[in-house]
Amino acid sequence: SIKKSGFGPNLFDEWRYLDHGEPGLDNSKRKINKDFVLNLARYKNGSILIARENFGCGSSREHAPWALLDFGIRVVIASSFADIFYGNCFKNGILPITLEKTIMDQVFTKVQNKVGYEITVNLEKQKIYDDSEIAHFEIDSFKKSCLMDGLDDIGLTLKNKIDIQNFEKKYQEIFPWLKGG
């Protein structure tokens, strides 16, 4: 697909639904797996996904972050990520946060035992909170800036649009025979 949308209804398809999905099938008419965590009422409309080790393994295409984003997920917190998936998250406006396994275990315990448990992420301060601070997380300053400013690769390029146009104009003056026709 060349569109970045429409993947959310198929996120975790084999776990969310009890039947076999097909391209073009109306997912609203499919049999829901009521036991799957993201189908539970208490997790509806959540924007932070907590996960375990090596999250995103096998998801080397950008379709995986597109599906998460389309589903409403803006942050994924896990003890580790597949490398390509991790990079693709940043390219698509999702914040992947890596925390130690012991901290993740504590978060999972709280989520399972406390109905209404919520966590928030403060990207600027690089902190995760519930009733108190859970953890500080590290993030590359450039990637942080891009997420804070809502910039993807194209947006970054367009920030320099005037400089690029000026360069192209001067370049064509110096090398007029290279100008396309």
Predicted segments — roles?
Residues 1-52, 56-181:
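Cytosolic catalytic domains that perform sulfur/thiol-centered chemistry
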